Structures are given as C-alpha cells and as structure tokens.
Amino acid sequence: SLIQFETLIMKVAKKSGMFWYSNYGCYCGWGGQGRPQDATDRCCFVHDCCYGKVTGCDPKMDVYSFSEENGDIVCGGDDPCKKEICECDRAAAICFRDNLNTYNDKKYWAFGAKNCPQEESEPC
C-alpha cells in the first residue's frame, strides 16, 4: 500500500516519501510521462513500471508484510502478488537512498507535466 511505501522510504532513505517524492520530476507522484529527469526520477519511473507488471492485486491499496533483518527490508507473506508489490517498493526505497546525492528539489520539485512531453516517454 502507499502507506507502507512511505514507511519503507522512511526506513531505508530516512526521508518522507510524501514530502520528498510525491511531486518530483516527471514520474514521482501520480501518473508520469516524458523522460525521467535525473536518477531519482528514474527510480520513480522504474517503480511505476514495476507496479504496471503486478497483476491480481492493487499496488496502491493492498497491504503486504515485511520485516527488518540486519538493517535490510525483507518482503514476506504467502501472497506472491503482495510480495511483488513489496519488492517494487523496497527497490524504489533503496534507489532513493542510493541517489540522495543528486536529488535536486530546486530544479525538479513541482516540475509539472508541461516539462514532460508525452512524445518523449520511454517504454518500460
């Protein structure tokens, strides 16, 4: 679920997903089009693609199970679909953490769809 995604971002990247990633670049937040603008925006693009491959459950609403082991997030549970959602969220949170050094809110926060032409969109 989106609430769990926020939790994973806080645990892994030590940032609030809502405040740092909900309206960044062309892909962080609802929807997405155009070219990813930087490494962080690419994290969101890849996350969107990951969610797009999930079938049989709702990535934004369905609750999955995870645990922390030796500082790492481990996705669990018996439902393969929900585990897949967790793996998408886990990978994005790690990607955010690994790209904090190039995060540029002055340039890409509230970037706007007008700067993300649909015709420049790339396939997953």
Swiss-Prot record:
Q: Name one GO molecular function term.
A: calcium ion binding
SUPFAM superfamilies named among the record's database cross-references: Phospholipase A2, PLA2 (SSF48619)
- What are the disulfide bonds? C26-C116, C28-C44, C43-C95, C49-C124, C50-C88, C57-C81, C75-C86
Q: What class of enzyme is it?
A: hydrolase
Q: Which CDD domains match?
A: PLA2c
Offer one example of a GO biological process linked to this entry: lipid catabolic process
Q: Superkingdom of this entry's organism?
A: Eukaryota
- What does the record give as EC number? 3.1.1.4
Positions annotated as active site in the UniProt record: H47, D89
User: Which is a Gene Ontology cellular component entry for this protein?
Assistant: extracellular region
Q: Which InterPro entries match?
A: PLipase_A2, PLipase_A2_Asp_AS, PLipase_A2_dom, PLipase_A2_dom_sf, PLipase_A2_His_AS
How, per the record, is the cofactor bound?
Binds 1 Ca(2+) ion.
Task: Report, as the record phrases it, the tissue specificity of this protein.
Answer: Expressed by the venom gland.
**What keywords would UniProt list here?**
Calcium, Disulfide bond, Hemostasis impairing toxin, Hydrolase, Lipid degradation, Lipid metabolism, Metal-binding, Platelet aggregation inhibiting toxin, Secreted, Toxin
Q: Which reaction does it catalyse?
A: a 1,2-diacyl-sn-glycero-3-phosphocholine + H2O = a 1-acyl-sn-glycero-3-phosphocholine + a fatty acid + H(+)
Per UniProt, subcellular location reads as: Secreted
Q: Which residues bind Ca(2+)?
A: Y27, G29, G31, D48
| Cofactor needs | Ca(2+)
| Family from the record | Belongs to the phospholipase A2 family. Group II subfamily. D49 sub-subfamily.
Report the protein's function.
Snake venom phospholipase A2 (PLA2) that inhibits ADP-induced platelet aggregation. PLA2 catalyzes the calcium-dependent hydrolysis of the 2-acyl groups in 3-sn-phosphoglycerides.
Query: What is this protein's record name?
Result: Acidic phospholipase A2
